[in-house]
């Protein structure tokens, strides 16, 4: 439940506050959108340090979440524009740094043949909480005001996010988790050696970098497209008033409602299907949803695009979170995930700045076509790994154990 509430923060509400309350410029908004990148890039360092300290993955994730809770608690008490940016950067860094540890917990507790099914089943709780909370919070933020601006600084929202992280910290501390083994080394970025030594892993990451940039470049612009539409009046005009409630409906409730339906399907397909075919199908839905979203000015068109995004994102979350468990040696899952997150951090940092810069130069509709083209091209390159995907689907080992 806590992760669903926090999902609405990082995908919608923090940027909404940046646009409609603080009225930040493009650089500040891109910084907030890219805030989690640092935590991703620090993944190898976190894994190395946790192994060195002898903590279990659950203990480490709990402490990181508790630190993020403290950041949001501070933001609930102080309404300062620069403290807001700094607090968001630190909170998201701590939150995303825990991801490789959580993936290792999945590896240890979910059987390989049913990992996708179990992941998608537990994700249902998160999806319901995200959809419900997103719609409710959007309605409260609108506050009966027909204008497009927030009526006041939503300190209560920051307090809820702090509570969600605190609850996540408690839950992590109670999870069955083990200490990391085989990850101690001479330097904290030692895990990056797997990028060099594992050819298939390297090719997947390169393709993922390209279609990830195509997707992430436009991801934060969805909030900008709706909440700051007046700044782009020469390019498009929305046929409705984008209040916080309607923005939450389009960007939070509809995608999550669709995810609730499709998440079990993608979870089962992840366990049974060729991974590369699955990833390409998901990328097709991402590309279509982006093009439709940024070519729509009506509520109907945007809602359809949001639904297609929900279809893609429901499977994308399973694939993104668990794919390394298919290709990495069991004891190196956290290492492989930390490398995946390191490169994810690079594209998470680059993409928002690139997107906010380009939308000032070309219409969002044209930018969506460029992104879709990048997604399709890199997906075709990824599909060249089809034979390897068949071996994984049949349960054959692809990666030899690499000596420590």
Locations of the language-model features?
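Helix-loop boundary and gating motifs at the non-cytosolic
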Residues: 1-41, 200-237, 241, 247-251
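Substrate-agnostic recognition of the 12-TM MFS/MFS-like secondary transporter fold
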Residues: 1-11, 32-47, 64-65, 87-148, ...
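Structural signature of the two symmetry-related core transmembrane helices
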Residues: 59-73, 277-292, 372
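Helix-loop junctions at membrane interfaces in 12-TM secondary transporters
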Residues: 75-88, 294-305
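C-terminal membrane-cytosol helix-exit motif in multi-pass small-molecule transporters
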Residues: 162-180, 378-386
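Juxtamembrane intracellular "pre-TM" segments in multi-pass secondary transporters
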Residues: 177-206, 232-239, 398-404
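C-terminal transmembrane helical hairpin of 12-TM major facilitator-type secondary transporters
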Residues: 276-317
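Intrinsic disorder in cytosolic terminal tails and internal cytosolic loops
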Residues: 386-404
């Amino acid at each position: 439940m806590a992760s669903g509430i926090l999902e609405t923060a990082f995908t919608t509400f923090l940027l909404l506050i940046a646009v409609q309350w603080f009225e930040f410029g493009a650089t500040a908004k891109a910084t907030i959108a890219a805030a989690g990148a640092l935590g991703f890039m620090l993944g190898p360092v976190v894994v190395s340090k946790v192994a060195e300290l002898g903590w279990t993955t659950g203990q480490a994730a709990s402490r990181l979440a508790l630190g993020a809770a403290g950041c949001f608690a501070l933001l609930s008490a102080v309404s300062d524009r620069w403290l807001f940016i700094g607090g968001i950067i630190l909170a998201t860094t701590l939150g995303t740094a825990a991801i490789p540890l959580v993936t290792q917990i999945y590896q240890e507790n979910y059987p390989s043949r049913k990992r996708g099914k179990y992941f998608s089943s537990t994700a249902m709780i998160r999806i319901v909480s995200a959809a419900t909370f997103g719609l409710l919070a959007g309605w409260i933020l609108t506050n009966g005001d027909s204008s497009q601006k927030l009526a006041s600084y939503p300190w209560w929202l920051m307090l809820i996010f702090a509570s969600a992280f605190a609850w996540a910290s408690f839950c992590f501390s109670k999870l069955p988790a083990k200490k990391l083994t085989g990850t101690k080394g001479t330097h904290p970025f030692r895990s990056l050696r797997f990028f060099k030594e594992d050819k298939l892993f390297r090719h997947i990451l390169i393709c993922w970098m390209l279609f990830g940039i195509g997707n992430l470049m436009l991801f934060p612009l969805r909030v900008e497209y709706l909440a700051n539409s007046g700044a782009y009046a020469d390019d498009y005009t929305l046929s409705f008033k984008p209040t916080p409630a309607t923005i939450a409906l389009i960007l939070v409730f509809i995608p999550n409602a669709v995810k609730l339906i499709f998440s079990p399907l993608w979870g089962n397909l992840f366990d049974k299907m060729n991974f590369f075919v699955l990833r390409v199908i998901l990328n097709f839905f991402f590309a279509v949803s982006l093009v439709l979203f940024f070519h729509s000015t009506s509520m109907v068109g945007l809602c359809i695009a949001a639904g297609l995004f929900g279809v893609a994102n429901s499977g994308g979350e399973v694939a993104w979170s668990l794919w390394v468990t298919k290709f990495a040696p069991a004891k190196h899952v956290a290492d492989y995930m930390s490398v995946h997150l390191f490169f994810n951090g690079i594209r998470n940092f680059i993409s928002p700045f690139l997107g906010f810069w380009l939308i000032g130069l070309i219409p969002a509709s044209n930018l969506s076509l460029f992104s879709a083209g990048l997604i399709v091209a890199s997906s075709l390159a990824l599909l060249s790994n089809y034979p390897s995907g068949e071996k994984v689907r049949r349960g054959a080992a692809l990666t030899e154990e690499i000596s420590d």
